[in-house]
């Protein structure tokens, strides 16, 4: 059972292929793109140990000349220094403009590989083979690439679209439970901002905390619906001039929490979950959303065993100050994405700081 979603943008188009056991046929899929021979696979040690051989063998069988570059796992390595090391490997193997960088891994690997592809020789081919749920439903789609700065997440980056996104849901079997739950945060986000049917489906599930609690057919449906939601938005607003900003639901406070904890204590999905809880509460206080809706969202987040309380010694003032460094700040005003109904949100500027502070105090231990 396979699904294909076409992404049509003003200057390019590509497919998202969602197909179980497709990792072993990555070479065949790339052959149809008429790529030049050289491919540099970028991964982290654990993912490369699991899937590097099957991907490289498939590429070689399809006639590609394959090299690899492994980056230590984690947000702390999502830096310009890591990008420079990718450039070194690209230079060593004489990658040219017609060559390809292939991201085999989660969101961190995808973001860095895409940024390296966008900037090496002013742009070479880029392929996404996401191995985490978060990367499958979010990070691999839409062309956002980049690295972190010590003072903020993804402050250095570029929009650069892949030639193909190949998703094999089977690889989720080796994904750590905590990372699976992190991906569910982005899935829940799509239900709140765009797809009421997806939200209702998540509500019907008894648990969302591991692959053991969701059968393969259901997880593939959830992945497909999530990808389609993101494609619907990105197709209308590729470079975040307006509508695409709604994809940042939960990310405003979420990014601040990640930054203030040094990208170590809390992962991206956990931060987004907390950000969604906060955004829901802000919307209620502003009279935009009903308390009942906020509680329904919170219940789904808890089904995924994601946090709804900030269990870290952070001061509300520090979080407020970090919000000012968010890349979505416009004319000095923090922009929040706030829900008005299930499947609908608004972009709101100028939320009173006292409202934000009150909500931050409510979600802290």
Curated annotation (Swiss-Prot):
Residues binding NAD(+) are 107-111, 131-132, 144, 153
GO biological process terms, alphabetically, are:
amino acid biosynthetic process; aromatic amino acid family biosynthetic process; chorismate biosynthetic process
Alphabetized UniProt keyword annotations: Amino-acid biosynthesis, Aromatic amino acid biosynthesis, Cobalt, Cytoplasm, Lyase, Metal-binding, NAD, Nucleotide-binding, Zinc
Its pathway? Metabolic intermediate biosynthesis; chorismate biosynthesis; chorismate from D-erythrose 4-phosphate and phosphoenolpyruvate: step 2/7
Record's superkingdom?
Bacteria
One Pfam family it belongs to = DHQ_synthase
Names of the cofactor(s): Co(2+); Zn(2+); NAD(+)
Catalysed reaction per UniProt?
A: 7-phospho-2-dehydro-3-deoxy-D-arabino-heptonate = 3-dehydroquinate + phosphate
Q: Which GO terms describe its molecular function?
A: 3-dehydroquinate synthase activity; metal ion binding; nucleotide binding
Which sites bind Zn(2+)? 186, 251, 268
InterPro entries attached here? Answer: Dehydroquinate_synthase, DHQ_synth_AroB, DHQ_synth_fam, DHQS/DOIS_N, DHQS_C
- Which EC class is this protein assigned? lyase
Q: Where in the cell is it found?
A: Cytoplasm
Could you name the Gene Ontology cellular component terms for this entry? cytoplasm
Q: Disulfide pairs?
A: none
Any idea what job this protein has? Catalyzes the conversion of 3-deoxy-D-arabino-heptulosonate 7-phosphate (DAHP) to dehydroquinate (DHQ).
Q: Which PANTHER family match?
A: 3-DEHYDROQUINATE SYNTHASE (PTHR43622), 3-DEHYDROQUINATE SYNTHASE, CHLOROPLASTIC (PTHR43622:SF7)
Q: What is this protein called?
A: 3-dehydroquinate synthase
Q: Which organism is it from?
A: Crocosphaera subtropica (strain ATCC 51142 / BH68) (Cyanothece sp. (strain ATCC 51142))
């Amino acid at each position: 059972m396979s699904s294909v979603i076409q992404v049509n943008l003003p200057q390019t188009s590509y497919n998202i292929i969602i197909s179980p056991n497709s990792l072993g046929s990555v070479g065949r899929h790339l052959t149809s793109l008429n790529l030049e021979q050289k491919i540099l696979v970028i991964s982290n040690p654990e993912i490369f140990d699991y899937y590097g051989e099957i991907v490289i063998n498939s590429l070689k069988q399809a006639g590609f000349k394959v090299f690899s570059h492994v980056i230590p796992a984690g947000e702390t390595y999502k830096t310009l220094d890591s990008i420079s090391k990718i450039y070194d490997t690209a230079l060593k193997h004489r990658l040219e403009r017609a060559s390809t960088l292939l991201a085999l891994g989660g969101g961190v690997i995808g973001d860095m590989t895409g940024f390296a592809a966008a900037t090496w020789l002013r742009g070479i081919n880029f392929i996404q083979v996401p191995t985490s749920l978060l990367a499958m439903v979010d990070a691999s789609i839409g062309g956002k690439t980049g690295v972190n700065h010590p003072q903020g997440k993804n402050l250095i980056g570029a929009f650069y679209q892949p030639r193909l996104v190949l998703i094999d849901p089977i690889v989720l079997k080796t994904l750590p439970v905590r990372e699976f739950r992190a991906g569910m945060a982005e899935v829940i986000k799509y239900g709140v901002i765009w797809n009421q049917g997806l939200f209702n489906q998540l509500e019907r599930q008894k648990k969302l905390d591991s692959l053991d609690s969701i059968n393969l057919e259901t997880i593939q449906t959830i992945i497909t619906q999530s990808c389609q939601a993101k494609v619907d938005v990105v197709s209308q607003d590729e470079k975040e001039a307006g509508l695409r900003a709604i994809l940042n639901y939960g990310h405003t406070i979420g990014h601040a929490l990640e930054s203030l904890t040094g990208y170590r204590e809390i992962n991206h999905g956990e931060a987004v979950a907390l950000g969604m809880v906060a955004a829901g509460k802000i919307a209620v206080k502003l009279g935009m959303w009903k308390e009942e809706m906020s509680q329904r969202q919170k219940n789904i987040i808890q089904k995924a065993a994601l946090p709804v309380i900030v269990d870290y010694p952070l001061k509300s003032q520090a979080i407020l100050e970090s919000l000012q460094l968010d890349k979505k700040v416009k004319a000095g005003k923090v922009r929040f994405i706030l829900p008005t109904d299930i499947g609908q949100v608004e972009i709101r500027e100028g939320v009173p700081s006292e409202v934000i502070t009150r909500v931050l105090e409510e979600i802290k231990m």
